């Protein structure tokens, strides 16, 4: 579970691997350093393998967010992980 580039400017690619044979519900959200939800990036069922999502540094309304540290939360039926990302404008 990572993002590249990090730090990033315009957008970043979030990559993660699922090792469960059966498709499972995956939720990927972006939070600011205060713990406030900024963007609901993905919610759906995914199967085994590598997966990639792109975050363009915007909120749920499509407005660009400010520079700072953001936390990407990857939640599945079995685990919840967080990853720190730095947006520099």
Spell out what each predicted region is.
Residues 14, 40, 45, 63-89:
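C-terminal tail/sorting-segment detector
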Residues 32, 59, 76-78:
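Surface-exposed loop/turn motifs at beta-strand-loop junctions within extracellular Ig-like
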């Amino acid at each position: 579970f990572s993002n590249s580039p990090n730090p990033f400017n315009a957008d970043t690619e979030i990559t993660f691997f699922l090792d469960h044979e059966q498709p499972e519900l995956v939720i990927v959200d972006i939070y600011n350093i205060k713990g406030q939800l900024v963007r609901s990036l993905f919610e759906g069922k995914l199967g085994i393998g590598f997966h990639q999502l792109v975050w363009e540094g915007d909120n749920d309304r499509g407005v660009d967010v400010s520079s700072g540290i953001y936390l990407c939360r990857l939640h599945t039926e079995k685990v919840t992980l967080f990853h720190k990302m730095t947006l520099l404008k």
